[in-house]
Regions:
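Hydrophobic core positions in small helical hairpin nucleic-acid-binding modules
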Residues: 63-67, 98, 158
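Short, acidic, Ser/Thr-enriched surface-loop or helix-capping motifs
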Residues: 48, 112-113
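Long, charge-dense accessory insertions within large macromolecular proteins
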Residues: 2-69
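General beta-strand structural signal in soluble alpha/beta enzymes
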Residues: 46, 55-57, 85-86, 90-93, ...
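A short, polar/charged loop-to-alpha-helix boundary motif
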Residues: 62-74, 128-137
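Conserved mixed alpha/beta core segments that line enzyme active sites in large multi-domain catalysts
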Residues: 25, 30-33, 52, 69-110
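Solvent-exposed alpha-helices and their adjacent loops that cap or buttress functional pockets
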Residues: 35-39, 81-84, 100-102, 114-115, ...
């Protein structure tokens, strides 16, 4: 019988948590945002091919977990499963389909094994300056918070889409 034992399941679970925790730690080490580097205002997760969250890193902000749990499903629906390729990177700060507010940016990458979609990795990080008046009492509308980035491809099959880059650099 080839059914994994409880010990094997626990080893696999610990490995998955280790991988997603390393994802979060890499983000902390390389972040430009002081909110990420010093306050840990981020979240990292691993997802199955349907966009269901399998695990979330221990490092980060628990407040991101609800938005992160639903986000990848929105990415799959907006991008279209038939348009998901190796080398892609997706991005958004859509407060309704990914982040909670414009100052949180979510990045999702599909993961492939032998040319077949195996799952997704996603992370959300707080960006202090996204333009606008800022979130909170000063902003009367979400559109006053700053730049709104709809769910889109930032990288298509390994090639950076310069449109968003040019808009941000403005």
């Amino acid at each position: 019988m080839n059914t994994p034992s409880n010990v094997a399941y626990q080893v696999m679970w610990n490995r998955m948590i280790s991988v997603v925790e390393e994802q979060a730690q890499a983000l902390v080490r390389t972040a430009f945002s002081t909110s990420v580097r010093e306050a840990g205002d981020l979240s990292a997760g691993v997802y199955d091919t349907a966009g269901q969250m399998l695990a979330q890193a221990v490092t980060g902000t628990p407040g991101h977990v609800n938005a992160m749990a639903d986000a990848v499903g929105h990415f799959i629906r907006r991008i279209g499963r038939e348009n998901i390729f190796e080398g892609d990177v997706y991005i958004t700060n859509d407060p309704w389909e990914g982040t909670g507010h414009l100052h949180d940016i979510t990045v999702v990458t599909p993961s492939f094994h032998k040319g077949e979609l195996a799952g997704f990795f996603g992370c959300t990080a707080h960006i202090v300056d996204i333009g606008g008046r800022g979130f909170g009492a000063d902003a009367a509308s979400v559109y006053e918070e700053g730049l709104y980035i709809p769910i889109m491809k930032l990288v298509n099959r390994g090639e950076v889409d310069q449109t968003l880059i040019r808009i941000v650099r403005g």
